[in-house]
């Protein structure tokens, strides 16, 4: 495989994350990704998209999310762009791990998950848009 690109543009609704994950799952099946790549990229995309949908937009703001998936022999990158409030997740600190489930507090653990499973996370703010890229070096199976 030389290079392959897929794109999806969404208005933000109650089903935005679900619609995006369906699109990603379709590509994973079409291109015969490994089970690990499919699981990790879908899990991390779900986390990022749900955070964007839940926290990035104010009521009445025309909200949009654009996804671009680029695949090469060596890596798969999911670029997520949104026109919501500026937020750089690569600069956020993950909360300390709790000693037990009873002590666990919600918040920030999805970022830990993305840092664990992705080989690279990058962020830029350009022209009023957040640009987050999740990259995995796990190549699709052929």
UniProtKB/Swiss-Prot annotation:
Reaction equations catalysed: L-seryl-[protein] + ATP = O-phospho-L-seryl-[protein] + ADP + H(+); L-threonyl-[protein] + ATP = O-phospho-L-threonyl-[protein] + ADP + H(+)
Protein name as annotated: Serine/threonine-protein kinase BtrW
A Gene Ontology molecular function term of the record: ATP binding
Protein's organism: Bordetella bronchiseptica (strain ATCC BAA-588 / NCTC 13252 / RB50) (Alcaligenes bronchisepticus)
Quaternary structure and partners: Probably able to multimerize; interacts with BtrV.
Residue ranges of coiled coil: none
Keyword ATP-binding included in the entry's annotation: yes
Main EC class the enzyme belongs to: transferase
E.C. code: 2.7.11.1
Functional summary from the UniProt entry: Possible negative regulator of sigma-B activity. Phosphorylates and inactivates its specific antagonist protein, BtrV. Upon phosphorylation of BtrV, BtrW is released and binds to an unknown partner(s) that might be sigma-B, thereby blocking its ability to form a complex with its partner (possibly an RNA polymerase holoenzyme (E-sigma-B)). Involved in type III secretion system (T3SS). Phosphorylates BtrV.
Gene behind this protein: btrW
Domain of life of the native organism: Bacteria
Additional information: Type III secreted proteins Bsp22 and BopD accumulate intracellularly instead of being secreted in cells expressing the mutagenized BtrV.
Disulphide connectivity of cysteines: none
């Amino acid at each position: 495989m030389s290079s392959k690109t897929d794109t999806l543009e969404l208005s933000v609704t109650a089903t935005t994350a679900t619609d995006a994950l369906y699109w990603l799952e379709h590509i994973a099946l079409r291109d015969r990704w490994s089970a690990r790549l499919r699981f990790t990229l879908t899990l991390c995309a779900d986390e990022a998209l749900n955070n964007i949908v839940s926290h990035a937009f104010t009521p009445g703001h025309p909200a949009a999310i654009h996804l671009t998936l680029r695949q090469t022999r060596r890596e798969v990158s999911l670029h997520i762009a949104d026109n919501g409030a500026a937020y750089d997740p690569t600069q956020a600190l993950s909360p300390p791990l709790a000693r037990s489930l009873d002590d666990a507090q919600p918040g920030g653990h999805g970022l830990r998950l993305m840092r664990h499973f992705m080989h690279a996370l990058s962020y830029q703010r350009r022209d009023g848009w957040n640009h987050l890229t999740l990259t995995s070096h796990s190549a699709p199976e052929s």
